[in-house]
Amino acid sequence: MKKVFLLLCLLATTTIATATDLWEGTHAVDWSNTLTIEAAKFADAQVGQKIVVEFKDATGEVIELHSNGGMLPGTRYAHFLYADQHEMEVFITPGMLACLKEHGMEICGKGFTATKVWYGDGKDNVDGNTVWTGYFWMDEWSTLEVAKTSFDGINWSDYKAIRFYSEANRTDYVINVLTKWGDGGKLGDQTTMTMTNEYAELSLEGIDMAARLDTDRLMVQCNKEGGNPFNFTAIVLVKKEVDTGVRDLTARHTSTASKNFNLAGQRVVNPGKGFYIVDGRKCFFK
């Protein structure tokens, strides 16, 4: 009886990883020899799961994931594969999933041989406002380039900000948000954005995003400055709210899921009386 009870406990607390194979073989990818995976293969795919492309013989050239004649939403614009790498992964956003289920996926690029493609367990915190998520290492002037298609179909009048999430757990790093290099390309930096230990937030007030995204990508450049390198993890749109101004809250009415920061950008677990940033909004706790 004890053995049966122990087995039931193990089953109840163990997470079983799942994977769905999409394709397996040997395919030398070139711009004139792409690998196509039909839409039907993604029938059971879900937001937050990861798609993994396994490969060999990489030579430092680019890989691009396409759908319906353009870059797959939620993917990097410039993603290079090197000899010491054997797989790349992308995490499914809502925009990506819609494209996959309607049009499938095409693996493009050059200088590598695809051997397997599958999808499976990934992240569990990807919501409907996420346009890119993954893990991108920010060190010295590292630049994440996200395909413009990640923003397809967005009505910018519904949104007030873009949040750039990371694992930096500090605010003393450099961040530049750009649509192109050179004059007129910068949307904001650490001096104009709201910086917290969890994310940097770019206000869209006064920015015509539809017009500014007249290029093929959105770029996020970071320099670690005096701290350690860190992972960049998500780009999330923040919707406008019906009400405005400072909220008057008490601690007992604050959701335990909310993350509270003081005005210096430091995380506060048990906030006392005063002003705080709660889920991106300035609030007063009694």
Describe each region flagged by the PLM.
Residues 273-277:
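Extracellular disulfide-bonded cysteine-rich modules/repeats
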Residues 20-99, 108-239:
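Extracellular ligand-binding interfaces
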Residues 1-4, 286:
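Positively charged n-region of N-terminal signal peptides that target proteins for export
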Residues 4-13:
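Sec-dependent N-terminal signal peptides
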Residues 240-264:
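Residue-level detector of functionally pivotal "anchor" positions at catalytic/ligand-binding pockets or at interdomain
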Residues 15-19:
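Sec/Tat signal peptide C-region and signal peptidase I cleavage site
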